[in-house]
């Protein structure tokens, strides 16, 4: 059995094809890495965003390369940079850049107000660093930066999964969900009451699964 894997990193996008041997161990048939190179230049020093559609295009090209060379691949695994989010519309299309884990909007002081990350810590008793997806989303809500057509959000690798499968609503693994912040790792769910307190419409939250 052959398996292909794609990892969407911040600086590179990597892929690998593995074959399961008779002894049960995996053998690497081929690995390949391409530059990400999709950062968007903005006038804000604190802003770290990337062209999401260009990232997906590069990931698709890499996966297509593997599938053409190894047509008997049976499974595809996706991993990628944690914490960041992209917004999607009702059809499952990406309608925003990728707000990466390096984005610092959660640390900005608006006038005499404390940074959003500190407000979350004080009001919700949650530690969520700037760059965590839900910190980014709360900031975007308050500053009218959420795209008008957006209805949900997810990580870049989960969006790639949506792109490949035609899924319209985001479905993310618990490991990715935890990286967005406001996640109860014992109950395996988002802390909806605290999110609502911060002004988040919980209907926007992606579905969460525990299985791979």
Report residues per predicted region.
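Surface "functional belts" at beta-alpha junctions
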Residues: 99
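Gly/Ser/Thr-rich active-site cleft segment
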Residues: 8-10, 121-212
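N-terminal glycine/serine-rich phosphate-binding loop of ATP-dependent small-molecule kinases
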Residues: 1-96, 122, 149, 196, ...
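FAD-binding glycine-rich core of flavoenzymes that anchor FAD
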Residues: 116-120
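Short, charged, surface-exposed secondary-structure boundary motifs
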Residues: 40-43, 108-112, 182-184
């Amino acid at each position: 059995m052959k398996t292909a894997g794609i990892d969407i990193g911040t600086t590179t996008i990597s892929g690998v094809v593995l074959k399961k041997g008779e002894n049960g161990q995996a053998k690497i048939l081929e690995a390949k890495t391409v530059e990400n190179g999709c950062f968007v230049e903005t006038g804000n020093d604190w802003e770290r965003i990337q062209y999401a559609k260009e990232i997906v295009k590069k990931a698709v090209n890499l996966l297509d390369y593997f599938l053409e060379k190894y047509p008997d691949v049976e499974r595809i695994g996706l991993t990628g940079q944690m914490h960041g989010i992209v917004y999607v519309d009702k059809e499952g299309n990406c309608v925003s850049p990728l707000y990466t884990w390096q984005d610092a909007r959660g640390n900005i002081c608006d006038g005499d107000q404390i940074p959003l990350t500190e407000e979350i810590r004080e009001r919700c008793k949650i530690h969520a660093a700037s760059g965590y997806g839900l910190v980014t989303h709360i900031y975007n809500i308050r500053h009218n930066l959420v795209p008008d057509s957006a209805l949900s959000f997810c990580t870049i690798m989960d969006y790639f999964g949506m792109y490949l499968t035609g899924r319209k609503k985001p479905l993310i693994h618990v490991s990715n969900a935890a990286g967005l912040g406001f996640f109860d790792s014992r109950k395996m769910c988002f802390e909806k009451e605290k999110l609502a307190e911060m002004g988040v419409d919980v209907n926007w939250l992606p579905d969460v699964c525990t299985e791979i």
